[in-house]
Amino acid sequence: MSASKIAFLGPRGTFSHQAALLARPDSLLCSLPSFAAVLEALSSRQVDYAVLPIENSTNGAVIPAYDLLKGRDDIQAVGEVLVPAHHCIIGKSLENVQKILSHPQAFGQCSKWISANVPNAEFVSVSSTSQAAALASKDITGTIVAISSELCAVENQFNLLVKNIEDDSNNRTRFLLLRSGGFQDDLSPLKEKSLLQFYLSHPKKLSAVFEVFAAHKVVITNLVVRPSCKFPWTYIYFVECLGMEKHLIDRVGKYCDTFTFMGSYTNQISYF
């Protein structure tokens, strides 16, 4: 049997690369240039799995990832992966920095170091931290640096100037491990944590959904709300929760205009 394939936001050295290695160490790695490309490869079954960052412990929800998940019922969450996000500065010199390149999430995770060391530098967003490092390594003026990972510097032999510039030494990024195909009820119990996605045309329906959760002691661990783009001021809700049971899926779904059970997986976070 051939080895499974797992897609991640590349190039190699990104935190997504690290997540893929942790999630599926025996799978073949497939580096892709964007989150959209990662999900397209998964839904078209070019790969068997994918990792997608959804939350950072310092900077919150990864909004572009959630927007790509809106309305999808062709993929399933089967795991979560926690990746320590220790950021480094890569480049030629810190003496005359005019631009800092990185993925947008990284800027928010390193704001204290930036303010203290290069407060006047221009932020330039690129598709990944590894792409930022590759671009900064080609700069011959000494005016451009990148926020990236130590793995990226080591794998590509880039010049590493400063380590561990993140605001919080416990900084972590949480990834979902996804596979193709919607949720299949195989009669086995759900795992500890579940991911739900639903659209509500009126806010009063949210109260009804939460009443079901409260009555059955379902604990909401994460709630992300995104515009539905159907009608103004209506929303799509992404809910992660502990204690969801199969008989509650229909109970919750009857209050929703659309409802997708996006999978269940082992919880990796200690909440209590």
UniProtKB/Swiss-Prot annotation:
Location in or out of the cell: Cytoplasm; Nucleus
Domain ACT: 194-272
Prephenate dehydratase domain residues: 5-180
Pfam families: PDT
The reaction(s) this protein catalyses: prephenate + H(+) = 3-phenylpyruvate + CO2 + H2O
Pathway(s) where this gene product acts: Amino-acid biosynthesis; L-phenylalanine biosynthesis; phenylpyruvate from prephenate: step 1/1
Molecular function per GO: prephenate dehydratase activity
Keywords in alphabetical order: Amino-acid biosynthesis, Aromatic amino acid biosynthesis, Cytoplasm, Lyase, Nucleus, Phenylalanine biosynthesis
The protein's role, per its UniProt record: Putative prephenate dehydratase required for the synthesis of L-phenylalanine.
Name the UniProt record assigns to this protein: Putative prephenate dehydratase
